[in-house]
């Protein structure tokens, strides 16, 4: 297979060791009450629904928010992420967060920003026992599970808005630009006959499998891997590596080997633009679906209320993606539960109450029917920990009013420090 791995780190065992050490150092900066917020049992099903494309103000996350930490604590939390990810992936995730801060600063999006991200541990950090990290907020949902000496990043959500912008230093930023480029490298390698099988029409579809929700892993549509040349297969693997090449080279190689072994039975389909020209059209949608991989990318035909003059924040400029392993999400530690809150991020207009919006529209933040007055808090959480949010979020990102995001979580009350 093609070399799609990072050279910045070497082995899975080293990543596990470095990440566990960084996690312990982060925990040493926290109070007992803060530790209680961070810890969950390894098999707590909360992990299956507490990641999303939505901001944390719309979908409650597990763990503790970076914005609720002191400067030293926040730096220690990010060191956990840096120990886990390779250099390219760390830059990708922090680049997404920087884009969120850009929207806060330039689009009056008060519920966004680079501190609106949560970190949680499911199980105790260890080099031998199973545990997992969940890190997420707007357009980020990292689920890294350490099990039996392996690391899996399925499922993971990565998105971005805006896809490309100029920062305060005059530098062009594009956290997920490689996703578009590698996709078109693959598309342009196909013959006309192959493109006819691949292409599903002009409509840019939304994600079929939303972050933090159940998924039926549809397959069988488009072109089959066995119909590709060896060169085309390598280009397809480079597309897939945007999601699988997140940690050390050994971890990436192990995942890619499994995907490569079943690539002939993997289908790819595509809709939307057929030329990589961000000045035209509304972007693209593609789906890669096989025995060991499920990936979707969908450009979003809405800016969710985050408008910046002269900057694309919808269409090409707003991306949602999903990566899952149909056989090994969360390393089998939990069964995916159905989301009780908003999901997806459809191509339907800007939506009332989006980031930076007034929230005055139907279903805006704080409107709608609130949850029950006795909405449960987190079992085992510190005394006085807040219960689940009562009001319904607005239609930020999805173009639809959603059900309440209230949920009960079963937390570990015996987490080691």
PLM regions and their residue ranges:
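Extracellular mucin-like PTS domains
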Residues: 401-412
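A cross-kingdom marker for long, charged
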Residues: 3-32, 36-71, 75-86, 90-374, ...
């Amino acid at each position: 297979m093609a070399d799609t791995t990072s050279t910045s780190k070497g082995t899975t065992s080293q990543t596990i060791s470095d990440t566990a050490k960084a996690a312990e150092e982060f925990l040493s900066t926290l109070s007992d009450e803060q530790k209680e917020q961070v810890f969950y049992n390894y098999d707590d099903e909360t992990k299956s629904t507490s990641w999303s494309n939505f901001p944390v103000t719309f979908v409650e996350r597990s763990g503790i928010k970076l914005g609720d930490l002191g400067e030293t604590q926040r730096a220690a939390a990010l060191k956990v992420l840096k120990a886990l990810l390779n250099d390219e992936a760390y830059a990708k995730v922090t680049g997404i967060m920087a884009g969120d801060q850009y929207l806060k600063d330039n689009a009056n999006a008060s519920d966004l920003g680079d501190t609106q991200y949560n970190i949680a541990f499911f199980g105790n950090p260890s080099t031998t026992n199973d545990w997992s990290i969940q890190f997420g907020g707007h357009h980020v949902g990292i689920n890294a599970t350490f099990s039996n000496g392996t690391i899996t990043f399925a499922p993971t959500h990565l998105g971005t808005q805006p896809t490309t912008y100029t920062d305060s230093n005059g530098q062009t930023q594009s956290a997920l630009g490689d996703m578009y480029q590698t996709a078109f490298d693959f598309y342009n390698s196909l013959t006309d006959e192959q493109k006819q099988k691949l292409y599903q029409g002009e409509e840019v579809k939304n994600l079929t499998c939303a972050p933090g929700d159940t998924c039926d892993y549809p397959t069988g549509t488009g072109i089959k891997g066995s119909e590709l040349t060896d060169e085309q297969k390598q280009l397809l693997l480079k597309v897939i590596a945007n999601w699988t090449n997140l940690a050390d080279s050994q971890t990436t190689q192990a995942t890619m080997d499994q995907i490569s072994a079943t690539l002939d039975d993997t289908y790819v389909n595509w809709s939307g633009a057929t030329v990589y020209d961000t000045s035209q059209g509304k972007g693209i949608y593609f789906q890669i679906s096989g025995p060991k991989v499920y990936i979707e990318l969908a450009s979003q035909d809405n800016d969710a209320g985050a408008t910046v003059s002269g900057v694309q924040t919808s269409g090409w400029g707003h991306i949602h993606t999903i990566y899952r392993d149909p056989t090994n999400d969360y390393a089998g530690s939990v069964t995916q539960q159905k989301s009780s809150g908003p999901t997806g991020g459809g191509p339907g207009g800007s939506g009332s109450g989006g980031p930076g919006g007034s929230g005055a529209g139907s279903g805006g933040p704080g409107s709608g029917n609130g949850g029950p007055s006795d909405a449960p808090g987190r079992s085992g959480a510190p005394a006085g920990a807040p219960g689940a949010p009562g009001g319904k979020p607005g239609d930020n990102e999805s173009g639809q009013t959603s059900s309440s995001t209230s949920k009960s979580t079963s937390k570990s009350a015996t987490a080691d420090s």
